[in-house]
Design a protein with these regions (language model features):
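Generic short amphipathic/hydrophobic targeting helices enriched at N-termini
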Residues: 18, 26, 34-37, 95, ...
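Hydrophobic core
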Residues: 13-21
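A short, structured beta-strand/loop element
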Residues: 61-62
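Serine/threonine-rich, low-complexity intrinsically disordered segments
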Residues: 29, 36-38, 131-132, 140, ...
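Structural signature of tandem-repeat unit edges
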Residues: 48-54, 65-79, 88-101, 110-129, ...
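Low-complexity, acidic Ser/Thr/Pro-rich repeat tracts that form intrinsically disordered stalk/linker regions
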Residues: 25-52, 56-58
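Bacterial Sec-dependent N-terminal signal peptides
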Residues: 1-10
Length: 230
């Protein structure tokens, strides 16, 4: 058969074949000389596994299925769902700037000792909402929230027996924090950014901006317990 006839036949066969592009997990790799079995994942499949996380099509992290004590929330996650880490054993956590919402009970009762929120000029934090009991009964000693946080749920930091200080940003809305710290027996200081229009801090005590109402008096400053405003 001539070279021309072979070329024509090859083109005819190529035209009869259609190709479909499918997604595979980003961690897939093959070493030379080995055979690897790969599960092909349809882009429409939900939830979408990514490492030890289950993340839906909207970027909501619905569950952590791993066993590591040190966890990094990946970039692209927009929300950490209610009780997403209910079966985890966390001690150290890094949260990417893309996270906008931390849901109710997200990290409740974790032995969490260190938390870092990505928040810099190149990657400003988008975190706006912290849900009810989000960090309740964790082992954190200090918390510095990103300046983007607006709402903080009831009992968000309740029962945190090792918590000594909290620093709040400029955007925390009025009406927050009245019931955020019950049971935080070691809490000695609540500081707030001077540019916050709703709150002011004097010697670690939280007031409304005009100082007309007491919002929270840290429990370690008061032997009788945590004082709260109306």
């Amino acid at each position: 058969m001539s070279h021309r006839k072979v070329s024509v036949l090859a083109l005819a066969l190529a035209g009869a074949v259609s190709f479909t592009t499918v997604g595979v997990p980003a961690t897939f790799a093959v070493d030379a000389g080995t055979t690897t079995s790969v599960s092909v994942v349809s882009p429409a499949a939900q939830p979408n596994p990514s490492g030890d996380f289950e993340i839906d099509k909207n970027g909501v992290l619905t569950a952590y299925t791993g066993s590591s004590t040190e966890v990094t929330i990946p970039d692209g996650v927009t929300e950490i769902s209610t009780e997403a880490f209910g079966n985890a054993q966390l001690t150290k956590l890094w949260i990417s700037a893309s996270v906008r919402v931390i849901g109710d009970d997200a990290f409740v009762s974790q032995d969490l000792k260190e938390i870092t929120f990505q928040d810099d000029k190149a990657h400003p934090s988008q975190l706006a909402t912290i849900g009810d009991r989000a960090f309740q009964s964790t082992s954190l000693a200090t918390i510095t929230l990103p300046g983007s946080v607006v709402t903080i749920g009831d009992n968000a930091f309740a029962g945190m027996s090792r918590l000594t200080s909290v620093r709040l940003g400029a955007k925390v809305a009025a009406g927050q924090l009245v019931a955020a710290f019950p049971g935080a027996k070691a809490l000695a200081s609540i500081e707030v950014d001077a540019n916050n229009r709703n709150y002011a801090s004097v010697d670690g005590v939280l007031y409304t901006k005009d100082h007309s109402h007491l919002i929270a008096y840290p429990q370690a400053k008061n032997k009788g317990g945590l004082l709260r405003g109306p």
